[in-house]
């Protein structure tokens, strides 16, 4: 799901065996409607364009894909934000378009010929019995890592994964940060520190 320069939205999906695809979500009460039906774009690609008023930041959505003999709900392959329902554990894509975009402070990356790398896992970085966040890592762990002389961090389990106990090795979406650790803006702030 991409926001265009004019404020409109476009979403594309490659589904060569689909006969129809719909965008379903909070904005249409999770129903298949013609206003949210994708159009074939050739070579198995499908596309839907929407005016800016049709989607809002934070709304949950999925695709409903129909194919010969059936159909079902799917997460878009290239979505960049997923959230998991605390009760059902079901994932939904989430429209991510905050009113206030993150403003980068550091525009250059320091390159070292021999980096000293600290491997870490955001969720396991707290002394408390809980899943830690990007903000907590930035505030509590990063200063200690720097004090120890490390100049590079390698973060494990950044991509969304359904089972936390897998330590992120069972990736379910390659393009979305794990929502357990915080928002994309909080991750940007960590990277910018």
Residue ranges and their predicted role:
Residues 25, 124, 157:
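Residues that line or immediately flank small-molecule/substrate-binding pockets and catalytic motifs
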Residues 1-10, 31, 37-119, 124-129, ...:
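The feature marks proteins involved in alpha-glucan
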Residues 24-26, 66:
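Predominantly extracellular/luminal cell-surface or secreted proteins
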Residues 21-23, 61:
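Short beta-strand elements bearing conserved aromatic residues within extracellular beta-rich modules
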């Amino acid at each position: 799901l991409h926001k265009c320069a004019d404020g409109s939205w476009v979403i594309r999906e490659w589904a060569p065996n689909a006969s129809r695809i719909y965008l379903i979500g909070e904005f249409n009460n999770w129903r298949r409607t013609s206003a949210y039906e994708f159009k074939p774009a050739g070579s198995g690609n499908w596309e839907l364009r929407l005016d800016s008023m049709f989607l809002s930041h934070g709304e949950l959505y999925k695709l409903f894909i129909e194919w010969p003999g059936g159909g079902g709900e799917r997460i878009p392959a290239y979505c960049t934000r997923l959230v998991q329902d605390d009760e059902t554990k079901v994932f939904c894509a989430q429209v991510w378009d905050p009113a206030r975009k993150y403003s980068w402070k550091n525009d250059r990356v320091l390159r070292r010929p021999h980096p000293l790398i600290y491997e870490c896992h955001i969720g396991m970085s707290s002394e408390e019995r809980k899943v830690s966040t990007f903000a907590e890592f930035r505030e509590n762990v990063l200063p200690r890592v720097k004090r120890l002389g490390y100049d590079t961090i390698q973060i494990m389990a950044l991509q969304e994964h359904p089972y936390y106990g897998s330590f992120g090795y069972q990736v379910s979406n390659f393009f979305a940060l794990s929502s357990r650790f915080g928002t994309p803006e909080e991750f940007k702030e960590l990277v910018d520190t």
